Amino acid sequence: MEVVAYYRISSVKQEKSQLGLEAQKSSVRAYCKAHNLVIISEHTDSAVSGSAPLESRSGLVDALASISSHGAQALLVAKVDRIARKMFVQLSIENALERMGARIISAAGEGTQEEDNPNAVFMRRIMSAV
């Protein structure tokens, strides 16, 4: 499966934490290796809040455009909260991906893989609201 990877940090201070870019990349790449996924492009937003609207996040906009133009099947993130901190923002991104025939996959496994499983969808909604 071909995927587009997306990484986000909200502050320079966060870079040195377990949510830093290198930690996210390591997690995503290990997940790809374990699940035979191929990253076709990688996109990053640095010093951007997860509550910022989509239009102010150039890395995420580029990631979605890459999925659309290359036909990737998923947007792969280290954790779901790297996509959005507000449920409405995450739902709008999920909706855009669904229209492209793609979905979100979290390397942390936060219920994002089993789209047909109501429990997984429920868990994803809970995680995006926290």
PLM regions and their residue ranges:
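Short, structured surface patches at the beginning of a domain
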Residues: 1-130
